[in-house]
Amino acid sequence: MASLKVFSFALLIVLTFSVIGMIYNVESGGSLCCNSHPKFGKCNTNNDEQRCNRWCHNGCGNGKGGYYKSMSHGGQCHYYC
């Protein structure tokens, strides 16, 4: 009976940390999809847009790729949703 209580408690702890981790990822912008990524660098040419699309295609699980998004401080690579 004691081992069942220990197992239940351990499972509860694991599930709690899993949920906290998922919430932290969503709030911190951990997802690559649907976000702009300045670390890719500025996009200026058609070649950069193709490179951005390939980079996003490999980095996001939805397989949709990305595009060059014009912004006030220069273009950035943005993942499709």
UniProtKB/Swiss-Prot annotation:
Organism's domain of life? Eukaryota
Q: Which GO terms describe its biological process?
A: defense response to fungus; killing of cells of another organism
- Signal peptide region: 1-21
Instruction: Please name the InterPro entries in this protein's record.
Output: Defensin-like_20-28
Record-annotated disulphide pairs:
33-81, 52-77
UniProt keyword terms in alphabetical order: Antimicrobial, Disulfide bond, Fungicide, Plant defense, Secreted, Signal
Q: Does the keyword Signal apply?
A: yes
An annotated GO cellular component: extracellular region
> Pfam family of this protein, just one?
Defensin_like
Q: Where in the cell is it found?
A: Secreted
Q: According to its UniProt record, which protein family does this protein belong to?
A: Belongs to the DEFL family.
What is the designated name of this protein? Putative defensin-like protein 26
The root-end lineage is: Eukaryota, Viridiplantae, Streptophyta, Embryophyta, Tracheophyta
